[in-house]
Amino acid sequence: GAEKAARMEPYTTLKPLGSDNPRDLWKWLQGYQEKTGGHVLAIAHNGNLSNGIMFPIVESFTGKEIALEYAQTRSRWEPLYEVTQIKGDGEAHPFLSPNDEFADYETWDQGNLDLSVPKKNDMLRYEYARSALQIGLEMEKRLGVNPYKFGMIGSTDSHTALATAGEDNFFGKHSGAEPGPKRWEHPMAQVGDKKYEGWSMVSSGYAAVWAKENTRAAIFDAMMRKETYATTGPRMIVRFFGGWDFNEKDAQNRLPA
């Protein structure tokens, strides 16, 4: 509760109090666990507006090729990835998957979050989940550890604190625009003639977790196991198994976890 939280100052990326280097975030997470005895994980934000820095092969803060220690630390603290949300879908891009007609779902590829830096095609491979999984396998061959072996979730990222993504209970998209007849065209960000208009924002998605019971501890454990998946709205039940020792009964088993 509050007593535990008071032992740590909240992490911030704003300098000089904070840092936008992911290594410093990982150190903070480690410190939280050591000081409070609690358990934490980080879920990486949808990287489709990262302009190629979400899944790097070279550390942006050092300019050096990612090495074993970075791969181990990232895989430890970031088991999950937000693959879809209000600001576009981050699974695949038509430039990377030209033969997949589903790869152009809710594509946001004008630039970074505030549109101050335009998007270039050579950035795309390092910010979409499908190509990141491939990069992770390539890095595992070199390092023995895969930093991008993540589970996936979806979320709204609408900043409203409301669970209202369903059509029967929809309160609107981003909190930056008040309800009104012109909200559909209100830009979330704009630089010159480039802008993210209100109508272009997505209303999905959802995070699904296979947990043994509906408790915080069980849900946290399931997330650490990566027994999760993302949807863009439908509340579908999906399970995927990979291995050699399953039988036909396992395919029909609806028991979670």
Please provide the spans of the model-predicted regions:
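Extended, charged catalytic domains and RNA/DNA-binding interfaces, predominantly
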Residues: G1-A257
